[in-house]
Amino acid sequence: MASLQASRFMLTTSCSSCTRTRSAISIPKLPKFNVSIPQIPIKNRNFRVEEPILRLDGFAEDLDLSLSERQRQKKRGCDDQVLQRSRLMAVLEEVIDRVEMHKNIGEQRNNWNSLLLNSVNMITLTAALMAGIASMNASGIDSVSAVSIASTVLLASATGLAALMNKIQPSQLVEEQRNATRLFKQLRNRIEMVLREKSEDGISEEDVKEAIKRVLCLDKAYPLPLVGTMLEKFPQEFKPATWWPETKPEPTHSRTEANGWNSELEMEMREVVEVIKSRDAEEYEKLGNVALKLNRVLAISGPVLTGIAAVSSGFIGHGSGLAGVVATTCASLAAVVNTLEHGGQVGMVVEMYRNSAGFFSLMEDTIKTERRENGQVFETKVALKLGRSLSELRDLARRSSLSRFDGSSWSKLPSDLLNMVFERLGFADFQRAKSVCPSWLDASRQSASKNQIPWLIMFPEKGFFGDIPRQIFETQVNYDVLANGVRRVRPELGNVFHIKNTHLVVTMTGETLRVDSIIRSDSDVWSFCIYQMDSSNSKWEKLTSLGDEAILLDQGITVLANAIEGVNRNSIYFSGVQFQYGYVSSEKDICVFNLNTQKVERPYRNISSFIQSCDARWFVPNITRT
């Protein structure tokens, strides 16, 4: 810097001694100086260092390190954290105060319930006793009038007190304050946990706003005053309690494996929500509606009975003993009704169901919104709140998924859609679809099963070939014979007259038939007996005719014969090898048993002679319309 100042001084002196012959003053250029500023080791990387700026009056160093600005921002941040912490502490103080208030008011209203119940019952029973005495002592007119008037006044007072008591439902008020005390204690623990966990990171304004919202929601769900803000005790519809603020679900991309969430856990939580919605919540809402209706009936019956007793007691001593009977009976019944309603605390039961239904709604909302809590911790909390272990919770979710997959959701399909499905099914699939569930069975009765043309398949002696080239599919035919190594012989089993087989056949209308087939042991003569179940006595009755249907015994079904060319009505189609016993010549026979003539026919001899087959089967192809 000393050298710089010296150069500047020399420059000024030379300028003053210049000649005046020139018209302009020429200021010489300043020499260039390479000024190197040593690098200072700085730990804080937030400092900003700028190069010196040359000005007319010299060099002006601008080393803006913004240290003071950073300090001011840090101070403002600390002040904001202190402010938010103070606000949250103020909310905590209000929560603690509300815990004590709801606890004290709950005890007070519990005293109301017991005192009012005892007072109303004592007044009612005393008035009933006085009405009975007045009706017995009808000879003394003056004394009867006095006792009757006193009884009327007492019963009228009991009517008013009972109506007031039924209006406010003290037992329900007590349960409201119990729930409010418990929930405010939970909120207090929640705020204290936030204050502990965020002592270093700092409390945000969102934490304060959320705490305030929860306080206001609890105040709305469980109000302290009776006038103006008291909850409706007899609403038209039972609704669960709601004491939590509405939350928005967080985006799916925030779910990470590192936070304990995975696809299996998310699926498990969704199944738990379905169980809560379909089973627990519906059950408690149903029970709540029943308790609400019962409480409404009891609340109306008590004052009505005491009112009738009060009116009847006013007519005691006027020449009729019926007034005394009505007064004493109604007053006694009123005491019983009041004891059942308030001694049994039916209002408390209604509030308990309302709070329980609200709890399941809260669980459903909590799982759906999925606050970004660790997945495993969240699963543990859900299991404990539902009163289950982790293994039981996972088993519940798995069984719920399987039950919905197995048919509970299929049973809710609309009938129009089911009819469209049934129209595209073959006969066999149509019969299978009917057995899925009762709703499908009802829908199948509106849809006629599709009548298909039966096909006949022939099994060649040397194999079964199809459309696939150079492929032969072997089949095996079993024989019940004894062999001597050279030829088959029929075993001598004694005097065997019949061999009877029983088959079940499903008709076009879905009814079940029993078909007994009979064959002689020494011939190929068949006969059949058909039986139908009588639903009135659950016994099989013999059926003589199939009408326009024909039985395909190989498939166990019937087809509509008059709609298919070449199929005879009131007949049974079968292959002879199924019923053969020791008689070989008819293995490849394709037979028809006519129920009208009771004879077996072989209408397809030309097919049997053309194809060297060892067996034949009737079947209905499963060709569906798309």
Curated annotation (Swiss-Prot):
InterPro entries: Chloroplast_duf, F-box-like_dom_sf, F-box_dom, KIB1-4_b-propeller. It holds the Pfam family F-box. Residues 171-200 form a coiled coil. Keywords: Coiled coil. Gene3D superfamilies: 1.20.1280.50. Residues 407-453 form the F-box domain. The keyword Chloroplast does not apply. The keyword Coiled coil applies. This is Probable F-box protein At4g22030. It comes from Arabidopsis thaliana (Mouse-ear cress). The lineage of its organism: Eukaryota, Viridiplantae, Streptophyta, Embryophyta, Tracheophyta.
